[in-house]
Amino acid sequence: MFCTSFPRPRCPQYSNPINVKISQFGIEFIRGFGEAMAPYFPGEATPSLGFRDHGYLYCVSPEGADAARARVEMQRSLGAHTVYLDQGALKDRFPWLNVEDLAGGSWGSKDEGWFDSMGLLNGFRRAARAEGVEYIDNAVTGLEVEDDRVTSVKLSTGEVVSCGTLVNAAGPRAQQVAAMTGLSIPVMPHKRYSFVFASETPVPGRMPNVIDLSGTFVRPEGELFLTGNTPLDDGPADFDDFAIRHDEFEDRIWPALWHRIPAFDALRVMQSWCGHYEYNMLDHNGIVGFHPQIRNFMFANGFSGHGLQQSPAVGRAVSELILYGAFQTLDLTPFRYERIAANEPFLEEAVI
């Protein structure tokens, strides 16, 4: 996995109602983060997540217009502030956008944007330590299973830690951890390349995160811009392969950017990196819950690129399962592990 100081996304524009609800809880959590963290920062400024409420703008093709309108209607029925803009309204709202090949776009006009991931991580870490959590900088190399429980965890240094409940939150390495107990889940690392660039011509106004028909996205990052896409060779990668392909920007991303936003005719890449999505190859949705046979082994895996924005709701759900044995607030039963074993996808279409 990779961490970056660049703000990460928060968006309720999903095709599945439960994912919309998860993101709505995330928005509420992010907005109240400073207040929630205040007890753990006595006499100090609480961490600011710098939420940029600019929204996401999904470009919509003529053949995709009906489905896009239906998604917007569903999202709005749940209280989201998504709006569908036809071609003319889209051009009026974002005059710098090339709309000639678009039917329109769906835009989150409120409570949608991106935030500082490291601020979230550091706040969680500070609060957890204050509550008695011990962080161990080590690697898990083995799990001891007796009867129907994981009893201990072996670390690379040879230490052994006894286990009450094991939560597999290993991101792209989730399958490696599952395999230590003889289990298997369809979660593998998929490479994603990110590029930060400068443009000679600025984009005026409050620019959203634009998701092009090609799958390329771009959003402002201060005076710069962050972009990425889904590579053509989007297959499982080696767990330690973080080599970046710079030609992905030259050959695919830049042409897509220039077509959609003509102001991007002269760009200069300032920074780039490669990270891994923990990609659930069954249905692009997370796996949350206990294994039915190894009863203290819990999954929190496979979020396929939207894990950070779903982490507040999923973390709450994991704690509810551990404390109460059932979901108490948002019912995440559709994410249960049993669908994996039965090969029954719970599909999410809005994955970039």
What are these model-predicted stretches?
Residues 199-296:
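Active-site lid/adjacent beta-loop-alpha segment flanking the redox-cofactor pocket in flavoenzymes
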Residues 2-93, 215-217, 257:
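Dinucleotide-binding Rossmann-like beta1-alpha1 core, especially the glycine-rich loop
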Residues 101, 106-165:
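Helical element adjacent to the flavin cofactor pocket in flavoenzyme catalytic cores
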Residues 117, 255-352:
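C-terminal catalytic lobe of FAD-dependent flavoproteins
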Residues 51-53, 135-137, 186-192, 262-274, ...:
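A short coil-to-beta-strand element that immediately follows conserved catalytic motifs
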Residues 157-206:
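Central helical "cap/lid" subdomain
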Residues 21-24, 58-67, 107-126, 241-249:
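Short beta-strand to alpha-helix junction loop
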Residues 105-127, 171-173, 249-256, 303, ...:
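Mid-domain beta-loop-alpha active-site segment that forms a flexible
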